């Protein structure tokens, strides 16, 4: 027998998790480490630091890794250290006292779905503002003690880490997360195995492992497809945030929406409200429709129940920012659902189209979310108005300002983003109930009682803290990128805490106009190099790997930062993450934001700055439209002067230069006699904290969601579900009847032409007699009066309802006494609409007939 040179079978690897053992006295630390409460609790973070400060830095402030890597000798030393053990017991008591508070049963329960969550820098399942907002929301839900759970993804690679080449080119690096070293837990089934959710895709299943993140009292469930049960084509579904092609995107959104609901069902969780944070999660409503139909309800009855309990929050201000799928791709994965729902394919795909009968139109997740959610909201007052216009084509019988799209302005989680130094100032000077009453401006006004010197010293301490962080973290990166050690030393020497320090840190999308400051380099050079009034700019942020223009902006800023006149004055900090963000929003003097109007949906980084006495300089867009107060920051005008964007950019740049030269730097450097600081600047800081900060906390945002949406939706949903869904069935039947007869409803008689003789001071009585075709008072009439402006600039003058004055069989007579109080040219038309007190708003059943 010939001996082979190689002979081996394949090993069957078994995953074995060997945990580092802790002495029983320290076992409680593992419990704290696996709850992100530690991340917004100073006492817990400080405790982990003191266990082994050098190691805690080395593991990136990851307490799970810290406990794993603590040496045996160090563990023994901790147990013997009475003072340290006393701190361990005190922090654990704080934690247990916090966790033992029961949720407020009076407030509706919520299931919250989002593609990303920014909870801390250790758990890399976020990319930008959407994730930051969602993470802060869960933390505040915990602090506010509400009954909420959330669903997202456990990304193997998360969002990329950023570095810059020597010429400033962005390099994206994807590091695999080692799940066992993260502050997360496996969700176990009844047999003690990790729970698996089987998610149906056309003709096959995707198997998702379920993980749990403890966010204080809140549970966040994360789905993970990177396992051996799935094919090589499906394992990458949860590899990267916003990674892959459109096919991977639809697979992600099926997993989040449909898989998310199946996960909650398997866990036995049912909530009052289902909140889709962006359109990515819209298919959760599809699975809920299927569940109700499976229980024996018709599609229309199921839709009443799903809509009543669904809220969709949009974060995107332009239609191009939403997800659209070609019909062929959508059909590939969703072809089985019409049969499950008892409707046709055209009816099904039509729910994701603005024009359902247009077969060339792609399926839009945001449109589907609108059509399956009772309520919709933008994320600032301005963005609410932008969203009304954006979604107006869905309800063609109504003008944008008439539709039901509302808003809740974003806020930020105060304990996460407020530096410890400021929290001490607030604790010493504000009321004891401050944290439970964060929106009370009267409490914040106590900042005026804090001595100016204490305010200034707090600011200087945080500026120096930022500079130390930069020197510690970035020196090696700069040596690598810039080659010349002398240049790096020069940069470090020029970072002066006494300079006016300005931050511009955010996602590098072109609409955010990071280039604006560099429109006139000569003028900028004079500003940053004024020996009496030195100014320093910090830039940081990532561009999407597919966004060449955004990467070009980063490269250009880096190139400018290397010019001799800007060296150490314009500084780009790589790999913007939560840790760096916390240092910047508390460590600079001014937070600058220059988006193209009105493309900033909200923007929360400036709100974080407000909590830390950092003053905003921003275009009046997003949250700053509401937040700006004179004497508490600076604003560029909300209205555009030029339609030509290049001209507008030049004007805005000139405005920024002028503000810096003539207002901001003189104010900052005008030291009060006998002081080392400007009392006038401190006054601006105090005004900012007292009058702006109270209105932009996550506490206020959460309370707004309850008062504006959750409470009323939960109340209505409960009524629809009562008595075997009686009201839901009643409303569905009524809508079906109205829809069936709508086209046959007609005008028998009217005197609409009497409007031709309308004059001011005289009442004109209009009368319409309608044959309702046996519907029994199911329609309403109103006169819509528009100001006579160009067709593309609709401006409602007034809307006047008709009164029902006579009923005779199927004939209903409506009357309106029209008092023409204003002279001028107007456009008038009569609108007929379905009328039912059980409807939450008109767009819930947006049938309209103009009685021309």
Predicted regions and their residues:
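Catalytic cores of carbohydrate-active enzymes across secretory and cytosolic contexts
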Residues: 1-852
């Amino acid at each position: 027998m010939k001996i082979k040179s190689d002979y081996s079978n394949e090993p069957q690897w078994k995953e074995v998790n060997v945990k580092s053992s802790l002495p029983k006295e320290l076992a409680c630390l593992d419990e704290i480490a696996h709850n992100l409460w530690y991340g917004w609790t100073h006492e817990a973070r400080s405790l982990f630091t003191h266990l082994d400060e050098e190691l805690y830095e080395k593991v990136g402030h990851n307490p799970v890794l810290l406990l794993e890597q603590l040496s045996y000798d160090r563990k023994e030393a901790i147990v013997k250290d009475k003072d340290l053990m006393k701190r361990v017991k005190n922090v654990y008591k704080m934690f247990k006292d916090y966790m033992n508070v029961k949720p407020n049963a009076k407030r509706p329960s919520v299931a919250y779905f989002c593609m990303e969550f920014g909870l801390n820098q250790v758990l890399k399942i976020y990319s930008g503002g959407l994730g930051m907002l969602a993470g802060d929301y869960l933390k505040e839900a915990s602090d506010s003690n509400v009954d909420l759970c959330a669903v997202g993804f456990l990304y193997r690679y998360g969002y990329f880490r950023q570095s810059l080449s020597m010429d400033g080119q962005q390099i994206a690096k994807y590091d695999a997360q080692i799940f066992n070293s993260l502050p997360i837990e496996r969700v176990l089934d009844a047999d003690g195995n990790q729970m698996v959710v089987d998610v149906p895709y056309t003709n096959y299943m995707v198997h998702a492992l379920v993980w749990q993140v403890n966010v204080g009292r809140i549970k966040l469930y994360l789905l993970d497809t990177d396992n051996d049960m799935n094919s090589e084509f499906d394992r990458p579904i949860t590899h990267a945030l916003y990674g892959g092609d459109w096919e991977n995107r639809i697979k992600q959104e099926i997993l989040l929406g449909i898989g998310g609901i199946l996960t909650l069902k398997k866990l036995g969780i049912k909530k009052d409200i289902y909140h889709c944070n962006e359109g990515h999660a819209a298919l959760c409503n599809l699975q809920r429709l299927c569940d109700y139909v499976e229980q024996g309800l018709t599609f229309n009855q199921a839709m009443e129940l799903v809509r009543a309990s669904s809220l969709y929050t949009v974060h995107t201000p332009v239609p191009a920012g939403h997800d659209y799928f070609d019909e062929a791709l959508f059909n590939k994965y969703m072809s089985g659902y019409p049969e499950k729902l008892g409707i046709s394919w055209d009816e099904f795909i039509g729910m994701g189209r603005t024009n359902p009968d247009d077969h060339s139109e792609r399926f839009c997740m945001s449109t589907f979310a609108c059509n399956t959610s009772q309520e919709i909201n933008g994320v600032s007052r301005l963005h609410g108005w932008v969203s009304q216009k954006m979604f107006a084509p869905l309800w063609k019988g109504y003008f944008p300002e008439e539709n039901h799209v509302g808003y809740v302005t974003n806020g930020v989680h105060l304990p996460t983003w407020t530096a410890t130094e400021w929290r001490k100032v607030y604790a010493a000077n504000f009321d004891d109930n401050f944290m439970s009453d964060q929106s009370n401006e009267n409490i914040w006004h106590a900042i005026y009682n804090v001595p100016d010197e204490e305010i200034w010293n707090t600011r200087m301490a945080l500026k120096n803290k930022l500079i130390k962080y930069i020197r510690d973290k970035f020196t090696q990166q700069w040596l690598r990128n810039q080659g010349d050690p002398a240049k790096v030393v020069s940069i470090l020497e020029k970072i002066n805490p006494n300079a006016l320090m300005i931050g511009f840190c955010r996602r590098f999308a072109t609409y955010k106009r990071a280039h604006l400051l560099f429109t006139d380099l000569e003028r900028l050079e004079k500003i940053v190099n004024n020996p009496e009034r030195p100014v320093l700019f910090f830039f940081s942020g990532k561009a999407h790997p597919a966004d060449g223009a955004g990467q070009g902006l980063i490269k250009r800023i880096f190139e400018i930062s290397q010019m001799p006149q800007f060296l150490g004055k314009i500084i780009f900090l790589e790999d913007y993450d939560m840790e760096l963000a916390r240092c910047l929003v508390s460590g600079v003097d001014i937070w600058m934001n220059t988006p193209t109007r009105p493309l900033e949906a909200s923007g929360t980084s400036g709100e974080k700055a407000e909590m830390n006495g950092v003053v905003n300089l921003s275009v009046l867009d997003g949250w700053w439209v509401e937040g700006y107060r004179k004497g508490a920051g600076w604003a560029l005008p909300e209205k555009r002067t030029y339609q030509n964007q290049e001209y507008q950019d030049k004007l805005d740049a000139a405005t920024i230069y002028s503000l810096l030269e003539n207002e901001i730097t003189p104010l900052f450097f005008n030291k009060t006699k006998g002081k080392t600081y400007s009392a006038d600047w401190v006054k601006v800081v105090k005004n900012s904290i007292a009058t702006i900060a109270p209105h932009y906390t996550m506490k206020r945002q959460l309370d707004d969601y309850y008062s504006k949406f959750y409470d009323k939706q939960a109340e209505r949903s409960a009524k629809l579900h009562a008595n075997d869904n009686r009201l839901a069935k009643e409303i569905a039947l009524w809508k079906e009847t109205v829809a069936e007869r709508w086209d046959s409803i007609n005008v028998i008689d009217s005197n609409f032409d009497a409007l031709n003789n309308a004059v001011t001071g005289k009442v004109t009585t209009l009368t319409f007699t309608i044959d309702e075709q046996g519907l029994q008072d199911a329609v309403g009439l109103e006169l819509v009066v528009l100001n006579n402006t160009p067709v593309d600039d609709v401006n409602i003058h007034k809307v006047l309802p008709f009164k029902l004055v006579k009923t005779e069989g199927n004939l209903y007579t409506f009357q309106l006494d029209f008092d023409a109080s204003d002279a001028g040219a107007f456009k008038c038309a009569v609108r007929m609409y379905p009328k039912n007190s059980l409807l939450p708003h008109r767009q819930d059943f947006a049938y309209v007939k103009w009685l021309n």
